[in-house]
């Protein structure tokens, strides 16, 4: 059963432009100082139903929506991968069928290198696929001692150890490329 914590239908804080943000339910990182502790429990939140999905599609299809952000919880936790993949697939379908300009953002406590390197203990093909389908990921666990409330170091990240990776440029250049926004 797929679970989510909440949907922000009009969001300007979790990525560039106006977007929709879906907070998945469940995270095993439990970062000290996390702003979203209510999303830690994999059994908490709400069930992702056909009715919720229909509402989500309508929210994402609005002409002024330029971004989908998936965060949590941990979108790349094994338990959350089915929902994360479903959200990315819906967004991709909307982009293709509506010829919509929309960017896909994903927040994760994993690092980009851990996700895409098959030698990493955190590697899984389904986790890597979710990242490959995204335009940008904000990677790394939140670290309270590196908290940046002004976004003076990394815009859209909670702590200075986190990075915004331009996934498609990274794939193209075969190296980690940071977002230049």
Where are these regions (language model features)?
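N-terminal [4Fe-4S]-dependent radical SAM core
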Residues: 1-23, 28, 36-43, 176-177
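Short, flexible, glycine/charge-rich loop motifs used to bind or transfer phosphoryl groups or to couple energy/partner
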Residues: 11, 58-59, 125-128, 154
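Charged helix-capping and loop-helix junction motifs
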Residues: 49-53, 82-90, 119-127
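Surface-exposed amphipathic alpha-helices with a cationic face
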Residues: 84-105
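P-loop/Walker A phosphate-binding loop and immediately adjacent motor/lid segment at beta-alpha junctions
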Residues: 88-92, 147-181
């Amino acid at each position: 059963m797929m679970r989510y914590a909440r949907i922000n239908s009009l969001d300007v804080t979790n990525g560039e432009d106006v977007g929709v943000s879906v907070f998945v339910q469940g995270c095993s990182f439990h970062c000290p100082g996390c702003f979203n502790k209510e999303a830690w429990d994999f059994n908490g939140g709400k069930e992702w139903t056909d009715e919720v999905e229909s509402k989500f599609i309508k929210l994402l299809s609005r002409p002024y929506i330029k971004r989908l952000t998936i965060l949590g919880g941990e979108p790349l936790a094994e338990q959350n991968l089915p929902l994360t993949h479903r959200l990315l697939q819906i967004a991709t379908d909307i982009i293709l069928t509506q010829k919509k300009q929309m960017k896909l953002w994903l927040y994760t406590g994993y690092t980009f290198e851990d996700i895409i390197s098959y030698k990493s203990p955190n590697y899984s093909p389904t986790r890597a696929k979710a990242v490959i389908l995204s335009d940008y990921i904000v990677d790394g666990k939140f670290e309270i001692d590196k908290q940046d409330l002004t976004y003076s170091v990394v815009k859209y990240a909670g702590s200075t150890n986190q990075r915004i990776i331009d996934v498609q440029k990274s794939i193209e250049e075969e190296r980690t490329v940071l977002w230049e926004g």
